Each structure stands twice: as C-alpha cells, then as structure tokens.
Amino acid sequence: MSCMGAAVNIITTDGPAGRAGFTASAVCSVTDTPPTLLVCLNRGASVWPVFNENRTLCVNTLSAGQEPLSNLFGGKTPMEHRFAAARWQTGVTGCPQLEEALVSFDCRISQVVSVGTHDILFCAIEAIHRHTTPYGLVWFDRSYHALMRPAC
C-alpha cells in the first residue's frame, strides 16, 4: 500500500462530543452529484467516538511545507496542542477549517459503512473553501513529497 500516493489531509470535527482531528491519506472523491467524499477512520482510533457522535467533519487538504502539522495530528499529541499549532476558521458545519490548507471541504457524514477495522465515512459536502496556497503535499512510499507545480 505504500506505493499508492495520496494527498495529505487533516480531518477535523467540533460539536457535542468535542473537538478532534487526525491526519489521513485515505480520502477520495466519490461523486459530484451530490458532491461527496469518503474518509476512512479506524474504529480503534482515539478520535473515532468524537467523529461518530458529531457527524460533521472538515477535510483540510494540506499544502507543501505543512509536514510538521501533519505529524502533529498524526501522533499522540493532546488535541489542544494540535489545534494551537495553526490558525483556524469555523466552517458552516461548525468544524475547524485550516486557514493555510490548499482546500477545505466542510461536510456532514451522510452514511457509514464498516469494513474490517475501519469505518468508511461518506461525507456530503456542504461548503468548499479554496485557499491561496498553490502547492500540494502527497504521501508516497512512507514519506512526504511536495507538488512543486500549482495543484489547483
């Protein structure tokens, strides 16, 4: 699986169960009518109960140079320290949007399918916020790679 390159994303939520976020590369477009993404989340992850209860999330696609933030959200760092390391806006669903992301997709979880150890979260896009940063970040062969041509 390490040879499957993918965009690096920070998935965030905020709601009745609290604020949480994690780094994910298992994210992709499902359909444009209605606009839907999918996000894969391990049911054993510490953030799973928060996302499961809140039922909203924001997919923040990272830009080149945001590797430290990806590592922070991918580790065991307490949530308040993760969110303190960047600037955030609040999306229409109430989820945190990373100000310097390449793009942020503000979503409601419309369906959940369990496969093995993971839940596949189907996410209906409510709003898209495109940022001015042009260069993307991908994860390939267990390392980060900056896209040095404009991604959007």
UniProtKB/Swiss-Prot annotation:
Coiled coil: none annotated. Induction: Up-regulated by the nitrogen regulatory protein C (NtrC also called GlnG) and repressed by RutR. The keyword Flavoprotein applies. It holds the Pfam family Flavin_Reduct. The keyword Transit peptide does not apply. Gene3D superfamilies: Electron Transport, Fmn-binding Protein, Chain A. It catalyses: FMNH2 + NAD(+) = FMN + NADH + 2 H(+). Its EC number is 1.5.1.42. InterPro entries: Flavin_Rdtase-like_dom, NADH-dep_flavin_reductase, RutF, Split_barrel_FMN-bd. HAMAP family: RutF. Belongs to the non-flavoprotein flavin reductase family. RutF subfamily. This is FMN reductase (NADH) RutF. The lineage of its organism: Bacteria, Pseudomonadati, Pseudomonadota, Gammaproteobacteria, Enterobacterales.
